[in-house]
């Protein structure tokens, strides 16, 4: 992992622990935990928790996001649709782990996700035959699956557009996926449905924003240190060529 992600810690959501880093199915990379939270709905005045969700990101997400978002507060990021859109569509690998708190069938889960995806695509006018076929395959892959408490749906999202899907009954992360769908819109939509404008886990969004603020600021500090090192190296070269001028310049910097 990059130096600025070594401070990443685990997150516990209910009884589910999301470790600080994982190697997703179908990937050769190790991703860090961006954030995690619960998904639930209010039923008759009571909030019922259905799943715990963890979102992992490739290391290059930090410098990529820092270009636009460093210096922002956690609240600003939490409230920014564009920030989460940059995560969903950014040129980095993403991994999402959805672990059940209450039992679900594969059909229940896939149909709800598909319904949200199709509605979003139609509202944007981007629902085509390719997406319709991808949704059919998505539902078919989940058809015979069952998810008792502690079981997980695992999604590895490649920046090239593929979506690797895996299943785990005991919290472990398999090395290979159960199926791969080559549809960029669907790949992005799965994560979008969780942390997007109408995402199903506001808690995961807030946790993601809060944790990334620290990493973005650390990355900014790293950039500053690298810049200072470049200046020092430059001064060392200049010192050999023009010792008197450099000593004078260095002295002025100390005074300031």
From Swiss-Prot:
Q: Per its database record, what is this protein's job? A: Catalyzes the intramolecular cyclization of bicyclic chalcones into tricyclic (S)-flavanones. Responsible for the isomerization of 4,2',4',6'-tetrahydroxychalcone (also termed chalcone) into naringenin.
Annotated TM spans: none
* Taxonomic superkingdom: Eukaryota
The name on file for this protein is Chalcone--flavanone isomerase
Q: Where is the composition biased (Basic and acidic residues)?
A: 228-256
Q: Which UniProt keywords apply?
A: Flavonoid biosynthesis, Isomerase
Report the sequence similarity comment from the record. Answer: Belongs to the chalcone isomerase family.
**Site feature: Important for catalytic activity:** 109
Q: Which InterPro entries match?
A: CFI, Chalcone_isomerase, Chalcone_isomerase_3-sand, Chalcone_isomerase_bundle_sf, Chalcone_isomerase_sf
What tissue specificity does the UniProt entry give? Nodules.
Origin organism is Elaeagnus umbellata (Autumn olive)
Query: What extra comment accompanies this record?
Result: Part of the biosynthetic pathway for all classes of flavonoids, a large class of secondary plant metabolites, many of which are brightly colored.
Task: Give the lineage.
Answer: Eukaryota, Viridiplantae, Streptophyta, Embryophyta, Tracheophyta
Pathway(s) per entry: Secondary metabolite biosynthesis; flavonoid biosynthesis
Region Disordered: list its residue ranges.
219-256
